[in-house]
């Protein structure tokens, strides 16, 4: 059995809080995956970090309990433990860093706006909406969001923050 999932180590260590939204509610560590696999008679025999989606983990499990796990399995267990991922302290720090990041981003954007500069968002994926909503970035800060001309989001508005999504041609024309 092979599964690939967002890896919590990347999400937390790289402050990728914007990737947590309705389509991405699961972020795994190897230890909880091991518990899950054991519940169904599987044994993790390999695990590797892969770059997909900002950092994922590919886990190989087998019903054959005689297969010896690769060195990668122990290496990742040790990495997660050494980084404190099995403690609440790690997640409290993550929460604190997210709040600091929000303040830093708002200050940066506000300073640019005070200079009467335009600020345009480029692209409107799901994680964009998470960032906009959490940081309360609206049309007072961002002028609009530019999106590819094939997007179904064109001429619509972002939820909650009400930013208009315009064809990127408008952005290139008005630089």
Where are these regions (language model features)?
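Short beta-strand segments
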Residues: 2-4, 46-48, 58-62, 120-122
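Short, glycine-/aromatic-enriched active-site segment of Class I SAM-dependent methyltransferases
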Residues: 3-26, 30-33, 37
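Short, solvent-exposed loop/turn segments at secondary-structure junctions
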Residues: 7-10, 52, 66, 125-129, ...
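Short aromatic-enriched loop/helix-cap "lid" or pocket-rim segments at secondary-structure transitions
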Residues: 12-16, 59, 157-158
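Conserved S-adenosyl-L-methionine
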Residues: 42-53
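Flexible, glycine-/basic-rich loop-and-beta segments that form/coincide
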Residues: 53-101
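A short, well-structured juxtamembrane/interface segment
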Residues: 97-115
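A solvent-exposed beta-alpha-beta segment
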Residues: 110-175
């Amino acid at each position: 059995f092979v599964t690939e999932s967002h890896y919590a180590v990347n999400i937390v260590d790289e402050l990728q809080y914007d990737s947590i939204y309705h389509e991405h509610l699961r972020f795994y560590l190897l230890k909880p995956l091991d518990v899950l696999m054991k519940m169904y008679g599987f044994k993790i025999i390999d695990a590797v970090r892969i770059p997909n989606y900002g950092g994922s983990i590919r886990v190989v499990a087998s019903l054959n309990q005689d297969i010896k796990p690769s060195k990668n399995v122990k290496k990742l267990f040790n990495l997660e433990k050494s980084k404190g991922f099995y403690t609440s302290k790690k997640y409290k720090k993550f929460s604190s860093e997210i709040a600091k990041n929000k303040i830093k981003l708002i200050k940066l954007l506000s300073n640019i706006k005070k200079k009467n500069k335009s600020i345009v968002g480029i692209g409107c994926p799901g994680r964009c909406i998470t960032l906009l909503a959490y940081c309360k970035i609206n049309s007072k800060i961002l002028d609009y969001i530019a999106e590819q001309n094939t997007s179904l989001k064109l001429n619509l508005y972002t939820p909650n923050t009400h930013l208009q999504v315009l064809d990127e041609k408008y952005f290139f024309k008005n630089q």
